[in-house]
Amino acid sequence: MNKNIIVVGANQTGLVFAAFAKTAGFDVTVYEAKKQCDVAYDWTDDMVEETFEEVGMPLPPKEIYTRKRNWTFVPPEKGVNVLMDLPDDQLDMAIYRRPFNAWLLSRAECAGVKVFYETPVKRAIVENDVVLGVELENGEVVPAGLVVDCGGVISAVRKSLPESLKITRNIDKNDTFIVRRTFFNRPENTARPKYTNRAYLKHINERGISWCTLSHDEKQADVLIGRVGEMSDKTYENALADIRRDNEIVGDKIVTGGQLLQIPVRHPLSRFVANGYALLGDSACMTIPMLGSGMASGMKAGKMLSDVLSSPVTENPFSVENLYRYQARFMKEIGGKHAAVDMMKNWLLNSKKGDVDFLLGKGVVSRKVLIEASAGHMIVMSPAEMAQAAVKGIKKLPLLLNLAVLLQKMKKECKTASNMPKYYDEAAFSKWEEKYEKPFRK
């Protein structure tokens, strides 16, 4: 049996998996299309500290991360600022992606992983519904027992798969955020804002979010503007002008960033394994649907996949029967919650003008709910919390009833998504997929 594993993408998720798989005894090679210096973005992303303990990794060096400040959520009409107000010991880590990626690379290479940069992968090599390796852009064919696709939302490898594998090849544009994140200078003599990290929900009543945060050195303003599906230059400029009116810390000089990115913000794919193939991270849509953050879930999924390969239930660890266990575990522990949060995200994005302002302004949607949703957790309200919400939202009873129905549907979808058939059976798998995807059909 070919024990070679090819990982497509030297991002954080790919490097974490590669190190675990190599330590488990597999031969692992990573191919990355970009230059080493361009793989990770020059900014921070958030992650809970417990992630490292869960996957069995040490914390990165202290110079690689700091602590996130409390978020403040702002509804479209800006009538209220909802501050999360978490104690310091409950705040997320804010990890500097570029040095974090370099640290993960050193761990992977120390384990014996081979990493090739500026080596894009063109397509998967598939015969009789078994993935046998990849073809590089230079025409070289590289055989492998398993291809782990960390190629992101527009993965060329996933797009090249035959329809017979039943894996979604193209992600609908309306299941992605088009995002521009830019760091601007902070003009001199501007006051430190009361709310340092503001997230605008349905910003200026458009389908998306924006944020403005004060950098940790307090010298820059971190501005993200994202819209579902597409974002024109005019849309971006209008949103930026609105943020500038609210936040005097946003100067007119770009310090870094400014790239246009595409991020998946949907429930995980219904199928992300096949014989000799597994999707991992953004390529499987493992991000938190509310905000698009995916480092923590990707790292956890990488450890899950390595564990499954190390303790196969079949003679071939790369068989779909064995890899199915990886998907089932991910969906049980993480994916089910993400599916429920996706339903909440869609409901908020499609809500009528004024609804989000009412829910936040009256406290119907509490700080707790916002915290849970932004972290990708299942939202559960006790009878007492529901009663309290009813009192606060009585003036818009139809909206409140609509929200109550949504919460029940989310609970049902989380249960469905979390309970795949225990063992691989194609008919049962397909039946589960149909049930899982039903609430999201357009």
PLM ranges: what are they?
Residues 14-15:
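N-terminal Rossmann-fold NAD(P) dinucleotide-binding loop
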